[in-house]
Swiss-Prot record:
InterPro entries for this protein: ABC/ECF_trnsptr_transmembrane, Cobalt_transport_CbiQ, ECF_CbiQ
Protein name in the entry: Uncharacterized protein MJ1089
Top-level division of the source organism's lineage: Archaea
BP-aspect Gene Ontology terms: cobalt ion transport
Keywords in alphabetical order: Cell membrane, Membrane, Transmembrane, Transmembrane helix
Organism of derivation: Methanocaldococcus jannaschii (strain ATCC 43067 / DSM 2661 / JAL-1 / JCM 10045 / NBRC 100440) (Methanococcus jannaschii)
GO cellular component, one term: ATP-binding cassette (ABC) transporter complex
Amino acid sequence: MGFMKHNIVDNVAFSNKLRHVNPKLKVIFALSLLLISVFSTSFIVPLIIFFINSILLLFKAKVPKKIYAVFVGIPLGFGILNLVIFAFLFGTVEWFKINVFGFEIPVYKDGIELGLLLFGRMLGGVSSMLFLAFTTPMVELFYIFRELKMPDVLVDMMMLIYRYIFVLYEEYEKMKFAQESRLGTSNLKSTYKSLGALAAHLFIRAWEKGEKLNITMMSRCYDGKIKLLQTIENPSIKYILFIAIFDIFLIILAYLTKDFTLTSYIKI
């Protein structure tokens, strides 16, 4: 399999319909919604943020629905599990009981409310980060990091690590395919042996690629800083004001709904 096949996020980031929207504007939008989601005292606002991000990604950016479902599905599953655990194990105010094989298991109101809050925060935060990841290529984010005066060494390390995650993954798949074609995983004993050999060879391959990269960069007059040729203009003030007004609206809504409890409206 090729390198680009593994890097699904970058493929989508370069081909989505919001690709040419100012990346600084997308960073401001995504990070502001992330902060509102994380610090919201109401589960309603983070869920609204989740639906807004989902609509923008699926219908405006045209992110493939299957890809988005995969990336949202995993945290969604953990969120539902977390909600169930909080409903049964945390809380003091009993709402109702469930009879399971003669045992009555209580469900707590305050446990459900806390679980809903964490569930909403998780969905709002994850969708905000996915919006940024699916609409903005990493190279543009690295440039923005530079403009934010992050240390050059840190930005360079992030770029190299991001690149070589996928390079080493491709090496891993080649080695794994070679082992499987030679029946290296035919039983448990050979699987453990093959796994150890794969880890050792992958470490050696990573070391070799690091040495080659260092030689290549030094031969091209590397002076301790990777040059980024791209420049990004500052976004229009009117769009920033629009995002600010929208954020203020969400903050006010979060304040107005902070005492809202779902269980008080459902009678069992």
